[in-house]
Design a protein with these regions (language model features):
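ATP-dependent carboxylate/acyl-activation modules
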Residues: 1-194
């Protein structure tokens, strides 16, 4: 198929070091290599995370892990078993900017590029946008210290969130999810890519 690209790579070996070294002005940053993906997959909200969204959540979480912090990612299952990233918000000073300024606008742009968007008028595109936001899984590479990202997700129509948890204020985000009927999963493992 013309849509498949095969790449040949050398032998893939397991990482030999547990540390990552980054040169910065005036020194070097040494941090542990991020080798795990998640410690758990625990729904912490009243709204249960549907089984049919778990693979999409794992895909979105894996992409989120490899996205520069502070990362917000929205993954979408465009046909059964086939996933794509609709929006990605990397490298911002806070997650709300990653969400509102980068990720959500990219989702809206990409909705217009979906095959089912062809020939739709403005109202049809808006309806498709709402459908996509209702079906994406939103991932965050670290916990939410405030419920603002849950509120922003709800305002867009997002119903599923995956994040590590671990904030002293997790209960505020959980309460907002419960208020809005959003299902949220905690992975127990955060990922920072700086």
């Amino acid at each position: 198929s013309k849509d498949i690209r095969l790449l040949e790579v050398g032998e893939i070996k397991k990482a030999t070091t547990c540390k990552v070294y980054k040169h910065v002005i005036g020194g070097m940053l040494v941090q542990d290599r991020d080798v795990g993906t998640y410690e758990k997959f625990e729904c912490v909200t009243k709204a249960q995370f549907p089984k049919n969204k778990e693979e999409l959540a794992r895909f979105t979480w894996l992409v989120t892990k490899h996205t520069k912090s502070n990362a917000i990612v929205m993954g979408y299952e465009y046909k059964p078993g086939y996933f794509q990233i609709m929006g990605l918000g990397p490298g911002q000073p806070n997650r709300i900017d990653s969400n509102l300024r980068l990720c959500q606008p990219r989702v809206r742009d990409n909705v217009a590029r979906l095959p089912e968007a062809e020939g739709l008028d403005e109202a049809g595109l808006k309806a498709l946008e709402q459908k996509v936001f209702a079906e994406v899984v939103m991932g965050s590479d670290a916990f939410f210290p405030f419920p603002d990202n849950v509120e922003a997700a709800h305002d867009a129509g997002v119903r599923y969130i995956v994040q590590p948890g671990g904030s002293k204020k997790d209960d505020l985000s959980i309460e907002k999810c419960d208020e809005f009927g959003i299902a949220m999963v905690f992975t127990g493992m955060r990922h920072f890519r700086h």
